[in-house]
Amino acid sequence: MHLKPTRFFHANQPPMPHSYEMEDLCFDDMQYRWSPSNTPYRSMSRRYKSVSRSGPSMRVRSRTPCRRQTIRGKLMSKERSVYRHYFNYIARSPPEELATVRGLIVPIIKTTPVTLPFNLGQTVADNCLSLSGMGYHLGLGGYCPTCTASGEPRLCRTDRAALILAYVQQLNNIYEYRVFLASILALSDRANMQAASAEPLLSSVLAQPELFFMYHIMREGGMRDIRVLFYRDGDAGGFMMYVIFPGKSVHLHYRLIDHIQAACRGYKIVAHVWQTTFLLSVCRNPEQQTETVVPSIGTSDVYCKMCDLNFDGELLLEYKRLYALFDDFVPPR
């Protein structure tokens, strides 16, 4: 059987002599390519193809239109326009967005890497924070491996009224806060050359109730091995506090982070690392105002109770070592 080739040329291009080496042949609605065996070969391309020749270039065109791609593109464009209204509505309503995320059976993203220093104010609802030598990650609470293994933390009441009550009644439960007070005692020993005593330092620290709230929430959240350090805040005035974590890894549950941020309004809480030691830096945020409606307590009574406590010598030595370690630490701003 002899096939007569059908070729398409530009209008101003002269006809070329027949050459079947790289020429597409059209037979009915199917496109063929010539071969020595004269067996039709169906081309998979439906686009314009350029044929290289020794003479002027020529373009061979398929006779089958690209209807399937056109229909698929229209369907995808229609689907995008339908879902765009839904996602625009979700973006304007954070509660609806949170409800949608909680409704997912399998989370889309379980962990997100972060860099230190990291401001806890950048977290969103249900974000937990994991710090270790393997990296620093934000996780979706309840789905990260650590949350799954440890479960929900046993948090007592940490609303504003409960925190103020614990702050006022710390005189009756002073032994429970001996780790908090031991840091003030160790700081006064370091400041003896400046004729400072523990009572003025205690009064200055307790004048910022949010520092006590922070320690109380961390302790009630199960982190009873933490240590706290107090340093003068030269920028915002008063004191800033470092929460020092023991061990080489830290996991902050999302509920714990939410309670800390709610209790310490007007303070900036930043996660950082210093010489393989993880910590939280708690300092005043000049851009926000702190809560001022907190009853005052008798500092002298607390100091008398503190003097009656028998502090562990190893605890005081540990605090002296930690203060010497963090003397060169520059707090993040």
UniProtKB/Swiss-Prot annotation:
Record flagged with keyword Phosphoprotein: yes
GO molecular function: zinc ion binding
Protein name: Nuclear egress protein 1
Region Disordered, residue ranges: 45-64
A GO BP entry: viral budding from nuclear membrane
Zinc finger (CCCH-type) stretch: 128-251
Lineage top rank: taxon: Viruses
Subcellular location: Host nucleus inner membrane
Function summary: Plays an essential role in virion nuclear egress, the first step of virion release from infected cell. Within the host nucleus, NEC1 interacts with the newly formed capsid through the vertexes and directs it to the inner nuclear membrane by associating with NEC2. Induces the budding of the capsid at the inner nuclear membrane as well as its envelopment into the perinuclear space.
One Gene Ontology cellular component: membrane
Family: Belongs to the herpesviridae NEC1 protein family.
PTM text: Phosphorylated at serine residues in the N-terminus. This phosphorylation regulates the localization within the inner nuclear membrane.
Self-association and partners: Forms a heterohexameric complex with NEC2. Interacts with capsid vertex specific component 2/CVC2; this interaction directs the capsid to the host inner nuclear membrane to initiate budding.
InterPro entries membership: Herpes_UL31
Pfam families, sorted: Herpes_UL31
Keyword Hydrolase applies: no
Keyword vocabulary terms for this entry: Host membrane, Host nucleus, Membrane, Metal-binding, Phosphoprotein, Zinc, Zinc-finger
